[in-house]
Design a protein with these regions (language model features):
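NAD(P)+-binding Rossmann beta1-loop-alpha1 motif at the extreme N-terminus of oxidoreductases
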Residues: 1-36, 40-43, 50, 179-180
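Hydrophobic residues within alpha-helices
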Residues: 5-6, 71, 174
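Small-residue helix-packing motif on alpha-helices
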Residues: 20, 30, 48, 184-191, ...
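Rossmann-like NAD(P)(H) cofactor-binding subdomain of soluble oxidoreductases
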Residues: 27-28, 37, 45-121, 125
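Internal alpha-helical scaffold of NAD(P)-dependent oxidoreductase catalytic cores
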Residues: 92-102, 118-155, 168-205
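A short glycine-threonine-serine/GTX helix/turn-capping micro-motif
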Residues: 156-165, 186, 214
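NAD(P)-dependent Rossmann-like dehydrogenase/reductase catalytic/cofactor-binding core
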Residues: 193-254
């Protein structure tokens, strides 16, 4: 995810390579990122905390406590802290860093890797509107971003953050069905991906309810409604809702 954020910032001209300083767990990763993006790198998280205007904590929630232990004494009260770690609340981050800090949380998703991400962003009361707009501009560099209250961020993380995995499972199954019906594997993947992409664009462009768009495809007595009935009988909706429920529950335990 950090690479997607770096790529978006550079592509949209939000920052120059020399204005970005990054760290990683391994020297190999540092070398690869430096070579690809031309950014500055450091083996010290503390150094980055001391120098940053916006300190981006682009680590998994299980790693965040260890990173904070390294940077706590280097964080300044005038810098923005932007965390993408799921489940770690603003209050948790403030307490862990031991100060009255400006904290923003951002929940992006993997489509950010191709500039089509979807991010929910929230802040504490110390972050000004101008500072929040800087963070929103950053988030928009790799997709859509919307400010939300923190109480919704776990739901957003499940609906937009985890859902690409669910969509890919659906696409894989759809492609397998196409192969079973005689399509080549490459054909099945291509047609499936385009169908999902086009459907998403249609929903965004028209603003229509997904149920209405579904009904537009289902002709009376036609083939599609037969498939819809099969999905209903197998509990598609309930399965999807349950998947989101358990994702939210797990996030709150992190």
């Amino acid at each position: 995810m950090a690479r997607a954020m770096i790529g978006g910032m550079l592509e949209k001209g939000i920052a120059k390579p020399e204005e970005i300083l990054g760290s990683a767990k391994t020297q190999a990763t540092l070398d690869a990122v430096s070579e690809k993006y031309g950014i500055c790198v450091s083996g010290s998280n503390r150094e980055i905390a001391e120098k940053a205007d916006i300190l981006i904590l682009a680590v998994k929630p299980q790693m965040l406590a260890g990173v904070i232990e390294e940077i706590r004494d280097g964080v300044r009260q005038d810098e923005l802290i932007l965390s993408i770690a799921a489940g770690k609340t603003i209050a948790w981050i403030e307490e862990a860093l031991g100060g009255n800090l400006k904290v923003v949380r951002c929940m992006p998703n993997t489509p950010a890797m191709v500039g089509e991400g979807c991010s929910g962003v929230c802040r504490n009361e110390r972050v000004s509107d101008e500072e929040m707009e800087r963070c929103m501009t950053l988030a928009r560099s790799f997709g859509m971003a919307q400010e939300i209250p923190e109480k919704l961020i776990d739901a957003v993380g499940a609906v937009s953050g985890s859902s690409p995995a669910f969509v890919f499972m659906f696409m894989e199954a759809l492609a397998d069905a196409g192969v079973k019906a005689g399509m080549t594997r490459s054909q099945a993947y291509r047609f499936t991906a385009q169908a999902v992409l086009g459907s998403a664009k249609l929903m965004l462009a028209t603003g229509k309810h997904p149920g209405e768009l579904k009904d537009m495809v289902c002709s009376p007595g036609g083939t599609t409604i037969e498939g819809v009935q099969a999905l209903e009988e197998m509990g598609l909706r309930a399965s999807v809702m349950k998947a989101v429920d358990v994702c939210v529950e797990k996030t709150r335990k992190l």
